[in-house]
A protein has these predicted regions:
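A bilobed periplasmic-binding-protein/Venus flytrap-type ligand-binding module shared by bacterial periplasmic
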Residues: 239-248
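Short helix-loop hinge/linker segments at domain boundaries
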Residues: 25-28, 35, 46-68
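A short LG(V/I)-centered, amphipathic sequence patch enriched
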Residues: 13-30
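Helix-turn-helix DNA-binding motif, specifically the short coil turn and the N-cap/start of the second
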Residues: 1-4, 8
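Short amphipathic alpha-helical coupling segments at ligand-binding clamshell hinges
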Residues: 77, 212, 248-262
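C-terminal regulatory
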Residues: 107-109, 119-239, 266-267
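Conserved amphipathic alpha-helical core elements
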Residues: 12-13, 225
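Central regulatory/effector-binding core of bacterial HTH transcription factors
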Residues: 62-125
């Protein structure tokens, strides 16, 4: 019951000699001491979990794996991979969250995050999964109607589909010409925080989208989308699997990371 939990928390705070929570009549939140204590507990539990798995050697993988990934990669690649992985390891449970926002893996308790680089967060360890170019894409019917750009500045006259991440729409697209890297501001009548939505709109002929190769490879091959300005595209984008630093990885997480890297490289 709530009263039992309250008493237990008060006893814990008394024993530690620190206030772990801020309490109001309507909310309960962690203090800085509480956040540090929670992270230490999470790390300890993860290390104990890894130690127990280590004792079982090569026995069946067990336990929960929490993963977050981008919408496009999650739907196109990660979901089929998880289906196959769980068929091979039936005692594992996967908790998957798809979002194009950058989440705090530590605070939100994720084991693995799938992100594109660069990765400025030193609190994370990372493993490179794949490198690939980006493409300026639209449906062939859109290009036929509005014309195919021959230089990035031509995008100013096109309806560009914008990814809106955490309230900060990505209106600036990067390009390169010879040794020069430059940016072009683009705009259009549609923004979304889900890359899959942008892809769907582009296939429907609504406008131009900037996508990573691994997100639209099948669409390009099938002719649903057509790329332009490939000669101006900037450096390839890295796709990483990241996990919190400073904690031992449970064997189930390590095995999944290795299998995912092999799967992505093979595909």
């Amino acid at each position: 019951s709530p009263s039992t939990v309250t008493v237990a928390l008060q006893k814990l705070e008394s024993r530690l000699g620190a206030q772990l929570f801020r309490r109001t009549t309507r909310s309960l939140s962690l203090t800085p001491d509480g956040e540090r204590f929670l992270e230490t507990c999470r790390r300890t539990i993860a290390e104990l979990d890894a130690a127990m798995e280590g004792l079982t050697g090569h026995g069946p993988l067990r336990g929960r794996i929490r993963i977050t990934a981008t919408n496009d990669f999650g739907r196109a690649t990660l979901c089929p991979f998880i289906h196959t992985f769980l068929a091979q390891h039936p005692d594992v449970v996967v908790d998957l969250l798809l979002t194009d926002d950058i989440l705090d893996l530590v605070d939100e308790g994720f084991d693995i995050g799938i992100r594109t680089g660069p990765l400025p967060d030193s609190a994370l360890h990372f493993r490179l999964l794949v490198r690939g170019p980006r493409h300026i894409c639209a449906a062939p019917a859109y290009w036929d109607e509005h014309g195919r750009p021959t230089h990035p500045r031509d995008l100013a006259s096109h309806n560009c589909l914008i990814l809106g991440r955490s309230g900060a729409p990505l209106h600036t697209w990067r390009f390169q010409s010879a040794d020069e890297t430059f940016s072009i501001r683009v705009d259009g009548d549609r923004l979304a925080n889900d890359g899959e939505v942008l892809r769907t709109w582009a296939i429907a002929g609504a406008g131009v989208v900037l996508k990573s190769r691994w997100d639209v490879a099948d669409d390009l091959a099938a002719g649903r989308l057509e790329s332009c300005l490939d000669a101006f595209m900037a450096d390839p984008v890295n796709l990483y699997a990241v996990h919190p630093a400073g904690r031992a990885l449970p064997r189930r997480v390590e095995v999944m990371l290795t299998a995912l890297a092999d799967h992505v490289t093979g595909s």
